[in-house]
C-alpha cells in the first residue's frame, strides 16, 4: 500500500475508527520491537512505515477534534 493511498483511506475513517487503528498499529509496533529484541525480525523497514502511519492518524485525529470544537 502506498503512503498516499493509506492517507486517503485514513481520511475516510471517523474518530472512533482512528483511535482503534492507532491502538492496533501501536500493538504491531510493540510486537516488532519484541521480535527485534529476540533477533527474529527480518523486515526492519516496517518500523518506519508503522511510525509514519501512527503519526498520520494522530494528526488526523487532532485536526478532526479541532474542527469539531471550532464548529460547535
UniProtKB/Swiss-Prot annotation:
Which GO molecular function annotations are given, in alphabetical order?
structural constituent of ribosome
Q: Which UniProt keywords are listed? A: Ribonucleoprotein, Ribosomal protein
Keyword Ribosomal protein in annotation: yes
The GO annotation for biological process reads: translation
Any single GO CC term annotated in Swiss-Prot or TrEMBL for this entry: cytosolic large ribosomal subunit
Q: Which Pfam families match?
A: Ribosomal_L29 (PF00831)
SUPFAM superfamilies listed in its UniProt record: Ribosomal protein L29 (L29p) (SSF46561)
Question: In which domain of life is the source organism classified?
Answer: Bacteria
Kindly indicate whether the keyword Ribosomal protein belongs to this entry: yes
HAMAP family the UniProt entry points to = Ribosomal_uL29 (MF_00374)
Q: Which family does it belong to?
A: Belongs to the universal ribosomal protein uL29 family.
Which NCBIfam families does this entry report, sorted A to Z? L29
Q: What is this protein called?
A: Large ribosomal subunit protein uL29
Q: Which organism is this protein's natural source?
A: Prochlorococcus marinus (strain MIT 9301)
Amino acid at each position: 500500500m502506498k503512503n498516499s493511498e493509506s492517507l486517503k483511506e485514513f481520511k475516510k475513517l471517523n474518530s472512533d475508527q482512528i483511535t482503534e487503528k492507532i491502538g492496533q498499529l501501536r500493538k504491531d509496533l510493540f510486537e516488532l520491537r519484541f521480535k527485534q529484541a529476540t533477533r527474529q525480525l527480518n523486515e526492519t523497514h516496517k518500523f518506519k512505515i508503522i511510525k509514519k502511519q501512527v503519526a498520520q492518524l494522530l494528526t488526523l485525529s487532532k485536526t478532526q477534534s479541532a474542527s469539531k470544537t471550532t464548529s460547535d
